[in-house]
Amino acid sequence: MSTAGKVIKCRAAVLWEKNKPFSIEEVEVVPPKAYEVRIKIVATGICRSDDHVVNGSIITPLPAILGHEAGGIVESIGEGVTTVKPGDKVIPLFVPQCGKCRACKHPESNLCTHGDLGRAQGTLMDGTSRFTCKGKPIHHFLGVTTFSEYTVVSEISVTKIDAASPLEKVCLIGCGFSTGYGSAVKVGKVARGSICSCVWSGRVGLSAIIGCKAAGAARIIAVDINKDKFAKAKELGATECVNPQDYDKPIYQVLQEMTDGGVDFSFEVIGRLDTMVSALMCCQESHGVSVIVGVPPNAQSLTMDPMVLLSGRSWKGAVFGGYKGKDDVPKLVADFMAKKFPLEPLITNVFPFAKINEGFDLLRAGKSIRTVLTF
């Protein structure tokens, strides 16, 4: 029986307040309005940015349904939708692409002005929610809201992908993989034969390592305080692994000594202010490029010696790897299907959706790279 045009009752993980576990609830999801799409989520990844909301370091309105990395199937569409149809496999886009704003039209920008990133309103574009639970409206997250069996997104926040693609794998392209991989190949523009360092070897960091290898880097140095991650880092392309706790000097000095003055490209993937500065300082003077990939806490400021930049180093930031969602995500899925890069090594756990809190526990304990939840 078709559910188009009807309110759908389904399971979702609601975060009622920060520093509390997710609560599996029955929620109501209303039909999509004009230029909106309702999606049945098949698989969704657990991202550290979601946990930043739980612990309060990223501020967004609560109660909310989080989640922003997923793959699903279009259930129904609102009036005026032309780019997807019911039955299409899709990836929701937490960085939308309207194709009309100045940012979308610029070849080097991917931060569409219609996105919720940075504004954290917790609604769709009309300022309202499509979710209710126990008679109360529930906030969206980043315009995609994937910790729900069904979600509603704007048409500009979803893109069609290859019908043969395995959603439990390509869902990683919806955030983590693209964020790391693109930071190397698209934003940093890693050069063949260069020396790279990646601070933190989690899922995004490992994706950056994959990108550095794909770009032809000669040396890729993984930096992490968890030695258990080094085997996976080397499997995916790291040539050397360094634990800062093994040294009695700052890690940027260690990297400078290892590389005759500094690396050509560095990637900070944790989101810590001290490691952001350290990643810049480990770069070679005159030409080194450091890319900030990790999401920093709200309302904090960097302090550093401006001579570090005046000496010729460059500092860049990367959201979603610099990719334009509608243009680039289908291409990345096609590249995965063509075996141009792996996703399987990044997935350490596949859990049923009801085990979402167990998945977050593994993330916090550093015992998973990526946990994928399936409905």
Curated annotation (Swiss-Prot):
Protein location: Cytoplasm
Keywords carried by this UniProt record: Acetylation, Cytoplasm, Metal-binding, NAD, Oxidoreductase, Zinc
Any one GO MF annotation of this record: zinc ion binding
SUPFAM superfamilies documented for this protein: GroES-like (SSF50129), NAD(P)-binding Rossmann-fold domains (SSF51735)
GO annotation, biological process: retinoic acid metabolic process; retinol metabolic process
Cofactor(s) it depends on: Zn(2+)
PROSITE patterns: ADH_ZINC (PS00059)
Residues that bind NAD(+): 200-205, 224, 229, 293-295, 370
Protein name: Alcohol dehydrogenase 1
Gene: ADH1
